[in-house]
A protein has these predicted regions:
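A polyanion-binding, active-site-adjacent surface
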Residues: 1-124, 140-154, 160-161, 173
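Charged phosphate-binding loop/patch that engages nucleotide di/tri-phosphates or the phosphate backbone
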Residues: 166-182
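Alpha-helical scaffolding within the catalytic cores
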Residues: 124-135
Length: 182
């Protein structure tokens, strides 16, 4: 189950969303998914449907693995991050053994650091966290904090062009060690 890249989002969504799409994600026309595809494409990574012939270069997961009640923007509890991070997220990272982990948003980034017991000197803004770059986990795994790629964040905090720039160091980290990589 090895993958060079692991992308960690916040949560899977709601029970209503799950039931509406019969357990499958609405892959086309969902702004978050479309934006994530663009960002991944910018670093040379493509998402394929399950069962498609692929290299296993990416593993997608979330900091919270359960479904929540309410709408997709419904709040999540801090204890869900603590519980899922310790019991599920850290073991997932250890099993997948990615070279790079991308944390989609502040909450996903905090969940990863908390799962590993990493104390981080938090700057005043998440923008500064993103600008400071990656943090190393054990076994030289790099965690890159980036903004979430949902439409609301893209429209209010960090547009697509800025996010594409945020992902450039991720591309370099994935290529490091490859022949001819910078």
């Amino acid at each position: 189950m090895d993958a060079d890249l692991m992308v960690v989002g916040q949560d899977w969504g709601t029970t209503d969303y799950f039931l509406k799409w019969k357990g499958l994600d609405q892959s086309q026309g969902n702004p978050t998914n479309d934006n994530l595809r663009r960002l991944l494409h910018s670093i040379g990574v493509e998402i394929h449907p399950p069962g498609a012939d692929q290299r296993g270069e990416i593993f997608l997961t979330n900091a919270i693995l359960c479904l929540k009640q309410g709408n997709l923007q419904a709040p999540v509890r801090d204890e869900w991050f603590r519980n899922c991070g310790r019991k599920f997220l850290k073991p997932q990272i250890q099993i997948v053994k990615p070279k790079v982990v991308v944390a989609l948003g502040n909450k996903a980034f905090r969940a990863i650091l908390n799962a590993y017991g990493i104390h981080y000197a938090w700057p005043r803004t998440y923008r500064r966290v993103v600008e400071l770059g990656c943090v190393k986990l054990p076994k030289e795994i790099l965690v890159f904090p980036v903004y979430h790629c949902g439409a609301r964040v893209m429209n209010t905090h960090r547009d697509l062009e800025a996010q594409l720039n945020d992902w450039k160091p991720i591309s370099k980290a994935l290529r490091s060690g490859e022949e001819g990589a910078a």
